[in-house]
């Protein structure tokens, strides 16, 4: 069939709509053209952009939301049913507690004995009612006692036993016997003094002008009193004028009256003398006790000294007691004569002044520590004989050493004299020994011995051994 000859199924209304749409588009085009010619840009056209990931919803969100809404409706129905059941149970429980049972057979079905509960509750109510009635009766009795008139009080046999009324410091009306009235009034005065409000607290409620006026009045009153008084010395209390400074516990505020001030000063002086006397007495008692203790310690030391002398260990006893004999003052060592170039080198061995005779030297950091100093069980010669010759010092260290001072015949019995015996050798007959004596009875120490060396090497080797 030919297309040109095919009739179009077009109605009149569709043609009118098409013509109207065409006319509207032509008008919009004209308006945009006029705006462009005038330089005014119209509203930009909206462009459909790609939706972002945040605006895009997950698949199945709407279906899940519908399911949630249905589930909420079901839950709400279940909750409503449970609430209705609970309300029915509560109403039934109230009826049963009141005793409104439907039937006795129904009562046996429940595990709770509601009849016994009703009986117990009624008993509790009766007890509470009885206690309330007793309290009400007691209150009435108290009111009746308070409302007794003077006619109900019997006449007193003695005028001092007469009942009287008075008002205390707090504004309360009181009743007591006439004989007790003075003591009660005195107590009331004491209470009123304790409850007195200080003027400083009252002044906080005043304005600045009123406070200044009060200060001016106080100053005028003080000046009038000062004019009435005779001329005399001015004290600190006269010029303090309510100073806010705190002066500490050592400060005493004397009275402004001369007689009272002198009396206070005499009292303070007397107290000071008493304190001084008590302090002196305590010092004297302390000194007496200390002297008695020292005397007892001296007796104990003497006893131990006697025992140690008998045993031949006098020094050990003194060390155990912590008593050390005072060292005798060493005689001044004569200065060595000037040495010639080819003469021998002389070395003078001096005593250590920081140690006591017969007592080993104790370092400062070792004071107060306990040390046990025993005796040599063997002689020095025996020990040197037992020593391995491999560990002995070389014999050439002591070649040419000669002792000019006489050797001490008394052997050393304590290891405290070891520092002076370090230079001994097994092959030498003449050995430098300590010049200290172990007997504390000696009043003066001997002169320091001198050692003569032929060469400087001998002297250095000797000092290596000694130190």
Curated annotation (Swiss-Prot):
Residues 423-446 have a biased composition (Low complexity). One of its GO terms (cellular component) is nucleus. The modification Phosphoserine is found at residue 198. The gene is Ccdc174. This is Coiled-coil domain-containing protein 174. Residues 64-76, 349-365, 379-390 have a biased composition (Basic and acidic residues). InterPro entries: CCDC174-like. The keyword Phosphoprotein applies.
């Amino acid at each position: 069939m030919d297309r040109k000859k095919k009739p179009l199924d077009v109605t009149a209304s569709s043609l009118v709509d098409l013509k109207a749409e065409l006319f509207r588009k032509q008008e919009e085009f004209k308006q945009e053209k006029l705006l462009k010619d005038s330089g005014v840009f119209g509203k930009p056209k909206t462009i459909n952009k790609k939706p972002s990931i945040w605006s895009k919803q997950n698949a199945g969100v709407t279906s899940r939301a519908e399911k949630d809404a249905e589930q909420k409706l079901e839950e709400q129905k279940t909750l409503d049913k449970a609430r209705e059941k609970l309300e029915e149970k509560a109403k039934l429980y109230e009826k049963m507690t009141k005793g409104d049972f439907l039937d006795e057979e129904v009562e046996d079905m429940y595990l709770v004995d509601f009849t016994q509960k009703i009986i117990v509750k009624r008993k509790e109510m009766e007890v509470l009612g009885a206690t309330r009635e007793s309290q009400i009766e007691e209150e009435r009795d108290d009111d009746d006692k308070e409302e007794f008139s003077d006619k109900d009080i019997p006449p007193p046999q003695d005028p001092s036993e007469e009942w009287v009324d008075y008002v205390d410091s707090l504004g309360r009306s009181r009743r007591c016997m006439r004989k007790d009235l003075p003591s009660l009034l005195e107590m009331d005065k004491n209470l009123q003094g304790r409850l007195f409000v200080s003027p400083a607290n009252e002044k906080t409620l005043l304005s600045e002008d009123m406070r200044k006026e009060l200060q001016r009045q106080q100053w005028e009153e003080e000046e009038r009193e000062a004019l009435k008084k005779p001329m005399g010395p001015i004290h600190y209390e006269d010029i303090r004028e309510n100073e806010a400074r705190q002066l500490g516990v050592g400060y005493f505020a004397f009275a402004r009256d001369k007689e009272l001030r002198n009396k206070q000063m005499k009292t303070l002086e007397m107290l000071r003398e008493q304190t001084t006397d008590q302090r002196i007495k305590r010092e004297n008692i302390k000194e007496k006790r200390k002297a008695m203790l020292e005397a007892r310690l001296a007796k104990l030391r003497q006893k131990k000294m006697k025992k140690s002398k008998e045993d031949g260990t006098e020094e050990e006893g003194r060390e155990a007691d912590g008593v050390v004999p005072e060292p005798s003052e060493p005689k001044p060592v004569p200065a060595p004569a000037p040495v010639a170039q080819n003469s021998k080198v002389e070395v003078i061995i001096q005593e250590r002044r920081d140690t006591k005779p017969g007592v080993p030297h104790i370092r400062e950091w070792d004071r107060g520590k306990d040390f046990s100093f025993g005796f040599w069980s063997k002689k020095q010669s025996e020990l040197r004989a037992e020593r391995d010759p491999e560990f002995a010092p070389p014999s050439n260290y002591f070649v040419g050493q000669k002792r000019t001072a006489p050797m001490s015949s008394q052997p050393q019995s304590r290891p405290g004299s070891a520092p002076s015996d370090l230079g001994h050798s097994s092959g030498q007959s003449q050995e430098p020994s300590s010049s200290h004596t172990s007997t504390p009875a000696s009043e003066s120490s001997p002169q320091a011995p001198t050692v003569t060396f032929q060469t400087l090497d001998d002297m250095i080797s000797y000092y290596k051994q000694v130190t």
